[in-house]
């Protein structure tokens, strides 16, 4: 296989959650540009349709499913509907996430439960529903979005950090279970990127600069910085890589 074809996603179908904005939208657009047909999943329908239209306007193939991943019935319905557009997904990207920023003593049961349902549970149940079709093909990719907080604690982010630590270990478990069937499961752990999820930090210049200063590169991430890693983990280029978490954080986690 030529080097260019190693990274070519033509003929593949990717399902991406959290695709109405931020990291999910950036990954969906990158996959479409690399040749994949993309099924974009999110809760906010208007933003989701706009994201789909952008990909289609650029010549890509995209469709969307409105889904509240915190609701199990909605998640299962999404898995049922996904193959209707372009066929069964070959690639699943779990990029949806929330971060309820409260001091630990102020967190409610609902804060905890909703964070875990969206950030961790969905990353288990959605691939579980879609993996049988990948197993039948003998090829598939799961790309989970972990976090710098998978391995580091930050204030007022307790449930988020716990959920992302779980995502990192879930990735290993998925790899152990399914790699023998041709499904490679890996995770991307982003550092600080300007997204709706990080708005409280982005909107505080002092905090934003402080985070940048902790990287080796000297800046926080731009969404384009994730495209290469996301395509790599979804393509034949990563055929012998599974159960790994790649930190895309400018060296923050290595410091």
Where does each model-flagged region fall?
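Substrate-binding pocket helix/loop in short-chain dehydrogenase/reductase
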Residues: 103-104, 108-116, 142, 207, ...
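Active-site helix of classical SDR
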Residues: 127, 163, 171
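C-terminal substrate-recognition "lid" of short-chain dehydrogenase/reductases
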Residues: 124, 139, 219-248, 253
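Conserved glycine-rich cofactor-binding loop
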Residues: 13, 20-21
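Conserved glycine-rich Rossmann-like NAD(P)H-binding loop of the short-chain dehydrogenase/reductase
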Residues: 36-50
């Amino acid at each position: 296989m030529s080097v260019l074809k190693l990274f070519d996603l033509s003929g593949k179908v990717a399902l991406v959650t959290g695709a109405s904005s931020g990291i999910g939208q950036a990954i969906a657009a990158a996959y479409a540009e690399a040749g994949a047909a993309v099924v974009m999943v999110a809760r906010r329908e208007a933003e989701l349709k706009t994201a789909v239209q952008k990909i289609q306007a650029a010549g890509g193939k995209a469709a969307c499913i409105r889904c509240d991943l915190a609701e199990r019935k909605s998640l299962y319905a999404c898995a049922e509907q996904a193959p209707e557009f372009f066929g069964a997904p070959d690639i699943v990207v779990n990029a949806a996430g929330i971060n309820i920023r409260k001091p630990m003593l102020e967190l409610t049961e609902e804060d905890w439960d909703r964070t875990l349902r969206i950030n961790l549970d969905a990353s288990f149940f959605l691939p579980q529903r879609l993996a049988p079709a990948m197993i039948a093909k003998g090829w598939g990719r799961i790309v989970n979005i972990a976090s710098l907080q998978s391995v580091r604690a930050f204030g007022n982010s307790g449930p988020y950090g716990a959920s992302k630590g779980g995502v990192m270990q879930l990735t290993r478990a998925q790899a152990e279970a399914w790699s023998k069937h041709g499904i490679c499961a890996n995770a991307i752990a982003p550092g600080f990127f300007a997204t709706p999820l990080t708005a409280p930090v982005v909107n505080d210049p002092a905090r934003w600069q402080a985070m940048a200063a902790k990287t080796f590169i000297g800046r926080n991430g731009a969404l384009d910085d994730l495209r290469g890693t996301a395509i790599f983990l979804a393509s034949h280029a990563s055929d012998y890589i599974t159960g790994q978490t790649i930190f895309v954080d400018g060296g923050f986690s290595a410091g």
